[in-house]
Design a protein with these regions (language model features):
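Cap/insert and terminal regions of metallo-dependent hydrolase folds
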Residues: 65-153
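Structural beta-sheet core signal
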Residues: 57-58, 121
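Binuclear metal-dependent hydrolase catalytic cores
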Residues: 1-57, 63, 67, 72-73, ...
Length: 158
């Protein structure tokens, strides 16, 4: 992406925008919210939402250093639903290391390591076609049926 679409500045938005620092853990009504710093060059936050015995971990813009990062696996262990960045193939990653995004195989390994009950791989490379994504998802599901690719408008029962 390039100007004027990227980067987007707060001043270019036609809305009142305010920013707040949030603590590592807090509540929004009955929902417990925990945060973890992501590994991304522009900074990013990973969120864990827990309510009524179910938990969701949202980890986009995340470039893990290994297939089982201890800090992330401890944070996400046993979550009901893991939404995890999986933008690149290993071949693409060679050219995009340190961009702040994971590979599909690494994200699959992490989902297994942290014991997520369901996983949706998200933050797909925008250059991929729907057909390419479907083929990649089919390959992943052969060995990991609880791991799927996230889709726009998708609903998941927890």
């Amino acid at each position: 992406m390039s100007p004027p679409l990227w980067p987007v500045t707060a001043g270019s938005l036609k809305a009142a925008v305010s920013f707040h620092d949030v603590p590592d853990a807090f509540f929004v009504g009955p929902v417990a919210v925990e945060t973890m710093e992501s590994r991304h060059p522009g900074g990013s936050t990973i969120y864990k939402l827990t309510c009524g015995g179910v938990s969701l971990v949202y980890a986009t813009d995340y470039e893990p250093e290994s297939d089982a990062p201890e800090d992330f696996c401890a944070f996400a262990r046993g979550c009901s639903l893991l939404l995890l960045d999986a933008q690149y193939s290993p071949e693409e990653y060679v050219k995009t290391r340190d961009f702040g995004h994971s590979t599909i195989p690494r994200s699959v390994a992490i989902a297994r390591s942290c014991g997520a009950k369901q996983t949706l791989l998200i933050h797909h490379d925008p250059k991929r076609t729907d057909g390419q994504l479907l083929a990649l998802e089919t390959a992943v599901r052969e060995s990991s049926p609880h791991i799927r690719f996230g889709r726009e408008g998708q609903e998941v029962l927890l």
